[in-house]
């Protein structure tokens, strides 16, 4: 399946900015990293919409489901990554969800964590399944509601504010919880896992682009973390849930993105068969 992002606003001027691309060195230097450290960063890890002149993006998928329209927002001066698309992991998650649409619908209303623009959650709704799409940032939640309305997905898709550091008493338990690239730091990974244990009554489907932190050692030499500490923290905090890798996809420069399923042994055993992507 081919998935392409393109600018839906007509006109050459808009089309020039309506693409998804990677910004590696410029973004690194914008965070104030020394140039020697920026030069050692791996392949692009975050794909962001160039939104200075953006008027709307359409996510083109196989039919069904039909395309998803993304409401515009200007992140050009925002270096936080909040509400942006982490494309490699999102692609893998969407591919699996679409390939197992019947199983997804059988799980009842599902829950997306850390949704950003909400592409996987809207895909689930366009497949005819109920889903609650969540994020912790009010601005992102507002944009999610706009995206759901833009695509006419109410009432299949609902949007809610969910802060992983706060109680979740307003939420039910879900047989399917999913998300992409949520374990980008140890603290948030542990908080995410705690919410998964509270809210998941079946399978947590998690797509993750493996990352190894680059840092400056005491001797001034650039060093690379031996393990993916964010993912390690999530898996440790999710215990006693067991983990099974469903598929993986190679990325440039030796990196990869993996799709993991976390759950009790019985829930993992009931998953549909899958193969390496």
Feature annotation, model-predicted:
Residues 1-277:
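S-adenosylmethionine-dependent methyltransferases
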């Amino acid at each position: 399946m081919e998935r392409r992002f393109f600018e839906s606003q007509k006109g050459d001027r808009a089309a020039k900015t309506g693409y998804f691309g990677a910004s590696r060195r410029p973004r690194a230097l914008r965070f104030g990293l020394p140039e020697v450290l920026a030069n050692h960063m791996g392949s692009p890890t975050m794909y962001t919409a160039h939104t200075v002149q953006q008027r709307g993006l359409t996510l083109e998928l196989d039919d069904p489901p039909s395309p998803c329209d993304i409401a515009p927002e200007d992140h050009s001066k925002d270096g936080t990554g909040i509400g942006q698309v982490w494309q490699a992991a999102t692609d893998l998650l969407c591919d699996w969800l679409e390939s197992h649409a019947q199983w997804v619908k059988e799980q009842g209303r599902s829950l997306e964590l850390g949704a950003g623009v909400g592409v996987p959650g809207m895909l689930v709704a366009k497949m005819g399944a109920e889903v609650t799409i969540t994020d912790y940032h009010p601005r992102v939640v507002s944009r999610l509601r706009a995206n759901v309305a833009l695509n006419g997905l109410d009432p299949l898709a609902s949007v809610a504010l969910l802060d992983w550091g706060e109680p979740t008493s307003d939420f039910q338990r879900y047989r399917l919880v999913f998300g992409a690239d949520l374990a980008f730091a140890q603290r948030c990974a542990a908080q995410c896992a705690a919410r998964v244990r509270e809210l998941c009554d079946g399978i947590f489907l998690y797509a993750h682009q493996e990352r190894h932190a680059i840092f400056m050692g005491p001797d001034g030499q650039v060093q690379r973390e031996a393990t993916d500490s964010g993912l390690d923290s999530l898996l440790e905090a999710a215990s006693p849930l067991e983990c099974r890798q469903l598929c993986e996809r190679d990325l440039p420069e030796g990196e990869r993105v993996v799709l993991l399923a976390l759950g009790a042994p019985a829930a993992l055993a009931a998953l549909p068969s899958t193969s390496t992507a």
